[in-house]
């Protein structure tokens, strides 16, 4: 039950809780974002520094023997050439897009299971690359064992990734879950833990924006990102 509650929160964070925004393409990005976790899906040959997660979701759903909608079943890569094409198809209520949207809306529980599995796998990946393994493990379990502590971990790993991909760096500094945990120092559990996690996430995201190429104007996202981090301490 806790996972389903978390799933609804992530749906709200990523897609504003709006069904049609389960199939989305952000302005200025070279990929669409799909599902409750706004999973990234690249076109064939599209270079991307952000971790792609939609193909893994498709594989996970296949392993559960779920009947996939046409777009997911027939395309290894994102089938739309650009944002405008996807917007046009959505506006025309294209049946394949409608089918995809309905599927993603009706199968929120499977998507949250997928995100949870990603979280479980992430600790090993983070410890493999961290220079301070013990602190990472300690902080991970410190957050996980706090009341409502699974939500921040699951949401953040879905929101900004594990932080283990060397390509996901600006000026050699990452912004994933690993960097948030590495930046934490405390030992007490409970509310204080979640407040520290929330503040650490904001610190890492502020640093990302400071290190980013100003022409990308990432600053425009920051307030929304901070609002999301505030939900971790609630």
Per-segment meaning from a language model:
Residues 1-234:
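Cell-wall polysaccharide-cleaving catalytic domain and substrate-binding groove, primarily
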């Amino acid at each position: 039950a806790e996972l389903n509650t978390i799933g609804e929160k992530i749906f709200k964070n990523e897609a504003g809780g709006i069904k049609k925004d389960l199939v989305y393409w952000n302005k200025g990005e070279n990929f669409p974002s799909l599902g409750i976790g706004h999973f990234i899906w690249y076109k064939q040959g599209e270079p991307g520094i952000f971790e792609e997660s939609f193909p893994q979701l498709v594989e996970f759903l296949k392993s559960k023997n779920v009947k996939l909608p046409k777009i997911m079943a027939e395309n290894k890569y994102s089938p739309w050439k650009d944002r405008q094409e996807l917007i046009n198809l959505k506006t025309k209520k294209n049946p394949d897009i409608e089918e995809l949207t309905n599927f993603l809306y009706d199968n929120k529980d499977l998507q949250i299971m997928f995100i949870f599995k990603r979280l479980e796998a992430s600790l090993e990946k983070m410890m493999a690359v961290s220079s301070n393994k013990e602190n990472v493990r300690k902080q991970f379990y410190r957050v996980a064992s706090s009341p409502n502590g699974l939500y921040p971990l699951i949401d953040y790993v879905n929101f900004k990734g594990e932080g283990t991909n060397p390509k996901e760096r600006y000026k050699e500094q990452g912004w994933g879950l690993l960097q948030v945990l590495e930046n934490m120092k405390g030992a007490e559990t409970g509310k204080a833990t979640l407040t520290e996690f929330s503040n650490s996430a904001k610190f890492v995201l502020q640093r990302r924006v400071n290190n980013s190429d100003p022409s990308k104007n990432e600053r425009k996202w920051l307030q929304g990102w901070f609002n999301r981090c505030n939900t971790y301490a609630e």
